[in-house]
Amino acid sequence: MSEPESSVANNDGESTQAPQLAELTLKNVLGDIVNGVHFIIFDPLGNRFVVPVIILLTSIITKVIITKVPYTEIDFVTYMQQIQLVNQGEIDYAEISGDTGPIVYPAGFVQIYQWLYSQTNGGADIATGQSIFGYLMTATVVFVCVAYTMSPTTKPWVLFLLLGSKRLYSIYVLRLFNDCFTTAAMVGVTVFLQQGSYWYSTSSFISFLFAIVGADLFSIAISIKMNALLYLPAVVIIAYFLVGENILLFAIVLAIVPLVQILVGWKFLLPLFDDEAASQIRWNYINNAFNFGRKFLFKWTVNWRFIGEETFLSDKFSILLMGGHIVVLLFFIFTRFLNSKVTGKSIWQLIKDAFKPSSTISSNNKLIDYNVGPKLILLILATTNVIGVLFSRSLHYQFLSWYCWQLPFLLHSTGWNFIVCLVLWGAHEWTWNVYPSTVASSLVLVGILSSVLVGTWRNEAVWFEENNVVDDEKKNE
């Protein structure tokens, strides 16, 4: 005999059938578990639950590592020795050095580490320094999650990869490298430029303000470590469109970058003095902090071990890398970043419009479309940076922090199968945990970075589609 169906009365007094609950069986319970797991791995709507978990786990993991894993001194003592000299009044970069060498970073680095100097009792209180870097890593993850979820089709598994790098935790809380602050600043730049894209349709002036703040923070990133310059082409392109292709507003945004450099480096640049001593101090600052000809030691390279030391140290190899960087970057710029399907107009029209004083941006420009613009901005910044990383003269172990935050998103942007992406992520992590690097590890690293860039370029859907429909991506799960 079947169970009678229950009924309830609605507001009009009419009887309606109550919804039937699924029968409590092992099969149904297992089905719910499978659906839940699928939701928090593949469904973009799951990000609202996954993001808080990612942030919480990052905070917990950093604290556990600080407690359980011994700190390793590499450069922090040297940083503190250099800062001590600055605090004592030394402003000549030629006279500022520590145990592992002279100061080689701009004035933003000095100001940040002066603050760390004050918080850690001159570097003696390492535990406090580690805690600060732990909070920095957690804050960086917060903003990375914001940047990722500004793209509505980012799947949760991409966010989970942010937890997966052993080397990255080491760079932050066991080494205390200044690269971490540059990375945090550039993640901030990404979010501000994404916000400029999102709000453009509401107010172009708000978008302009976000571009200003982004340029300010970009210059601060450069003042900490000049690897942030790798982003320059992307920042310039994005800023140009966020001000509506208005050349006058664009000039204002660009002017922010050198202005901030002057203000941050004021006491080392001595702009109000023109005597011989001031000129020498100014030159020493510029030459040490922004030395593009710096030589790297072969024993520390992570990416070029397979080419041999003689080739690595040769000027021809350096020129080859520079040429490759320029060619690949221009290829991406003209075939993807400035493609008419993105900008709404041809390259030739863009050039002609650039000489007009008023706004000339196309209404079809995807970079100012709140639906897809934030995703494209992250994509352009990430690919530009990773191209620079691929052709870097050398990658040292702390340099992983330059781009590790972007790799999960780029893997997702290739459109490759989920399992393939996980395997590549694992292989990439392996290359950074082999010490010292080997021929095999460096070959795999260069191969993965090259493959990800090729895969991202080939996936036209991620660049040109009006809206990425989640259902269309299920075949890649």
Swiss-Prot record:
Identify the Pfam families for this entry: ALG3
Catalytic reaction annotation: an alpha-D-Man-(1->2)-alpha-D-Man-(1->2)-alpha-D-Man-(1->3)-[alpha-D-Man-(1->6)]-beta-D-Man-(1->4)-beta-D-GlcNAc-(1->4)-alpha-D-GlcNAc-diphospho-di-trans,poly-cis-dolichol + a di-trans,poly-cis-dolichyl beta-D-mannosyl phosphate = an alpha-D-Man-(1->2)-alpha-D-Man-(1->2)-alpha-D-Man-(1->3)-[alpha-D-Man-(1->3)-alpha-D-Man-(1->6)]-beta-D-Man-(1->4)-beta-D-GlcNAc-(1->4)-alpha-D-GlcNAc-diphospho-di-trans,poly-cis-dolichol + a di-trans,poly-cis-dolichyl phosphate + H(+)
Q: Name one GO cellular component term.
A: endoplasmic reticulum membrane
**Would the keyword Secreted turn up in this protein's UniProt record?**
no
E.C. code: 2.4.1.258
| Cytoplasmic side, ranges | 70-131, 194-203, 244-247, 338-371, 428-433
Associated pathway = Protein modification; protein glycosylation
A GO molecular function held by the record: dol-P-Man:Man(5)GlcNAc(2)-PP-Dol alpha-1,3-mannosyltransferase activity
Signal peptide extent: none
Q: Where are the transmembrane segments?
A: 49-69, 132-152, 173-193, 204-224, 226-243, 248-270, 317-337, 372-392, 407-427, 434-454
Question: Which keywords does the record carry?
Answer: Endoplasmic reticulum, Glycosyltransferase, Membrane, Transferase, Transmembrane, Transmembrane helix
Q: Where in the cell is it found?
A: Endoplasmic reticulum membrane
Which InterPro entries does the UniProt entry name for this protein?
A: Glycosyltransferase_ALG3
Where the protein is mainly located, per its record? endoplasmic reticulum
This chain's function reads: Dol-P-Man:Man(5)GlcNAc(2)-PP-Dol alpha-1,3-mannosyltransferase that operates in the biosynthetic pathway of dolichol-linked oligosaccharides, the glycan precursors employed in protein asparagine (N)-glycosylation. The assembly of dolichol-linked oligosaccharides begins on the cytosolic side of the endoplasmic reticulum membrane and finishes in its lumen. The sequential addition of sugars to dolichol pyrophosphate produces dolichol-linked oligosaccharides containing fourteen sugars, including two GlcNAcs, nine mannoses and three glucoses.
Q: To which protein family does this belong?
A: Belongs to the glycosyltransferase ALG3 family.
Designated name of the protein = Dol-P-Man:Man(5)GlcNAc(2)-PP-Dol alpha-1,3-mannosyltransferase
Gene behind the chain: ALG3
